[in-house]
Amino acid sequence: MTAGVSPDDYSIEPELLLRAYATGIFPMAEEADDPEVFWVRPERRGVIPLDGFHMPKSLQKTIRQGIFDIKLDNDFDGVIEGCASGTGERARTWINGPIREAYKNLFEIGHCHTVEAWHDGQLVGGLYGVTLGRAFFGESMFTRKRDASKVCLAYLVQHLVKQGFVLLDTQFTTPHLERFGAVEVPRKKYEKLLENALDGIVRF
């Protein structure tokens, strides 16, 4: 921490955050109540190839049933609160105060977006991420109703392809994401993918 700066004053400026993403770096916190963040540049990066997304048959059925109303950028605060709640299998969360503030600021200037699943007028799942050039950097997702976040992910991939995005960065891979086609790539390969994605501008 910088000398003379209290934890309550710690913040991440939007320009700094976007520069970090442009070089393959992103912030995390150890715990939700941590006053600061640390910066991560993984040796191996998780990505979902937009031409290699795998949709399980059970999810296809759920989508056809039309259970969820999908909205974009409708309730950022609700989505990040859902992601930070740390319920169920995600008993811990890395989303602290500075991260909430930083991504809200990016949302307000058009560089952070949400995909939301609504059911009976309630937000029941969603995800958020950062956009820069033709890249989407997925940050976190949550679900309060079965398959809600999965439907959001499927919608996100379809939307990114339609809009001309070329990179969906998941930061890390998990068994859950691998079911949908997520793979790990070495840092050098990722940086080439990122360089290509930053060459161009598309609208979310």
UniProtKB/Swiss-Prot annotation:
It comes from the Bacteria. NCBIfam families: aat. GO terms for biological process: protein catabolic process. Functions in the N-end rule pathway of protein degradation where it conjugates Leu, Phe and, less efficiently, Met from aminoacyl-tRNAs to the N-termini of proteins containing an N-terminal arginine or lysine. It holds the Pfam family Leu_Phe_trans. Belongs to the L/F-transferase family. Its EC number is 2.3.2.6. One of its GO terms (molecular function) is leucyl-tRNA--protein transferase activity. The keyword Acyltransferase applies. It is found in: Cytoplasm. This is Leucyl/phenylalanyl-tRNA--protein transferase. It is an enzyme of class 2 (transferase). Keywords: Acyltransferase, Cytoplasm, Transferase. It comes from Brucella anthropi (strain ATCC 49188 / DSM 6882 / CCUG 24695 / JCM 21032 / LMG 3331 / NBRC 15819 / NCTC 12168 / Alc 37).
